[in-house]
Amino acid sequence: MRDVHIDKVVVHMGVGESGEKLVKAENIMKTITKQTPIRSVAKMTQPAFNIRKGAPIGCKVTLRGKPAEDFIKTSLNIVNKTIFESQFDKSGNFSFGIEEHTDFPGMSYDPQIGIFGMDINVVLERNGIRITRRRMQKKKLPEKQRVKKEDAIAFLKKEYSVEVR
């Protein structure tokens, strides 16, 4: 009941513009994650970057279950199983980035496509979180049942042999 597990992994690529570059990023993400990405849109207009509100500027995929665990293992190997303590939030979630998609197995550099980086966000939880999400008789999650930063670090060290600096 107190064991920490991965709820979901969100992989995000921010391209900054729509068009051909975004389509290339979507194809790369589909190859890496084996799922179809959805487009993320700009929340506000940024005239300095020629970005309009509502314009598609990136893509993302949410992974759960076994695919999420496999993706995390591969991603942590790419960053040499090292995560900094500042990459954790107070709820035990953590995020890290990968600078080049070519680091993934089976991916190679193509001058027609270029190089894309990605952000990986991992949400950790314990069993019993359903009481906050269910439709009837919602309740607040007890403090002892919440995942804390220290719990997340211990989970990563135990399950994935990650070094936290």
From Swiss-Prot:
One of its GO terms (molecular function) is rRNA binding. Keywords: Ribonucleoprotein, Ribosomal protein, RNA-binding, rRNA-binding, tRNA-binding. Pfam families: Ribosomal_L5 (PF00281), Ribosomal_L5_C (PF00673). InterPro entries: Ribosomal_uL5, Ribosomal_uL5_arc, Ribosomal_uL5_C, Ribosomal_uL5_dom_sf, Ribosomal_uL5_N. GO terms for biological process: translation. GO terms for cellular component: ribonucleoprotein complex; ribosome. This is one of the proteins that bind and probably mediate the attachment of the 5S RNA into the large ribosomal subunit, where it forms part of the central protuberance. In the 70S ribosome it contacts protein S13 of the 30S subunit (bridge B1b), connecting the 2 subunits; this bridge is implicated in subunit movement. May contact the P site tRNA; the 5S rRNA and some of its associated proteins might help stabilize positioning of ribosome-bound tRNAs. Part of the 50S ribosomal subunit; contacts the 5S rRNA and probably tRNA. Forms a bridge to the 30S subunit in the 70S ribosome. Belongs to the universal ribosomal protein uL5 family. This is Large ribosomal subunit protein uL5. The gene is rpl5.
